[in-house]
Curated annotation (Swiss-Prot):
It comes from the Bacteria. Coiled coil: none annotated. The gene is yeaH. Transmembrane segments: none annotated. It holds the Pfam family DUF444. InterPro entries: UPF0229. Belongs to the UPF0229 family. Residues 78-111 are annotated as: Disordered. This is UPF0229 protein YeaH.
Amino acid sequence: MTWFIDRRLNGKNKSTVNRQRFLRRYKAQIKQSISEAINKRSVTDVDSGESVSIPTDDISEPMFHQGRGGLRHRVHPGNDHFIQNDRIERPQGGGGGGSGSGQGQASQDGEGQDEFVFQISKDEYLDLLFEDLALPNLKKNQHRQLNEYKTHRAGFTSNGVPANISVVRSLQNSLARRTAMTAGKRRELHALETELETISHSEPAQLLEEERLRREIAELRAKIERVPFIDTFDLRYKNYEKRPEPSSQAVMFCLMDVSGSMDQATKDMAKRFYILLYLFLSRTYKNVEVVYIRHHTQAKEVDEHEFFYSQETGGTIVSSALKLMDEVVKERYDPGQWNIYAAQASDGDNWADDSPLCHEILAKKLLPVVRYYSYIEITRRAHQTLWREYEHLQAKFDNFAMQHIRDQEDIYPVFRELFQKQSANQSA
């Protein structure tokens, strides 16, 4: 009788390889579902997992079947209603003959399948959410290091997933183990076989001694055969480790308008944008510094919690935030050693005489030293003087980008538009 002993340490993850293959195969449908789900989430749970639904038709597998046309006779088991040459009516369009949202009318016939729904983890969700995104114009200033990691081979390990198994190394270990476990028995077997051959040719015949030797030889051979050809102890997997790669250090300035003209819905959309930005930076680049600046009539550098949740408000003077950013850059972040980025969110409402000053500060002080400056305007109203001043900057500076957000659904597409990974030709 054969016995199978499951000694896998990661038995509960035995379908990991199949899961990864499924995520790769249906990446387009999963990313579409994620982009729709991100707009339905609250600010606090944007980095948790997600239930993803895929239409059943999209996950159908290819199969071999009879071609159309020709004459064929078929026997369908369980048929007690129809005979040959009967015409079967098509189910009515309103019936349940397919997947749907459940908003149609009821039907007494027809059948279909619901959409396929499965759960992805937090890490899988964030990987897909920020795929193909990067900080634009990142350069290696002074060869200062930022811990950006790349995967490298690092020998072998005794644990892993089946996709990483090393067949050659596992068989080498199997051979070494079987040699070590059976070496003594094989020497003893060789000695008994030599003794048996000597006795079998001697006179007079020693039948009892021959029978004893044959039994011992059979027992030794059985013991040798019971040593398994391969054991979990022999298995070796290719090991990979993440090593820091020489890269550049970066700082991201987050500027947000919290004036009285920003209603709660607009502030929530700005918070969503910056939370996406924070998750992206903290996940992609381990040592990126983030500077948070809130402003109304006065600007103030704050920590992360105060930036997102403080209730302080007031009038609107955007230039106060730009002046404070310029001061912080001069004090702490030398442009020759740091890649400086900035993202500004506002509803576009600003004191009219202040907008030309914003244009001047950006054109003369900030844009010459930053790698990339992005401005998002969150409003359903017509653009005002600040937007028009910034349009002149966009025409003059390649490192300045601006986008308009009207509704919550625009946040994620705009975020991807601003931080889309550049090709080699574009970055050059």
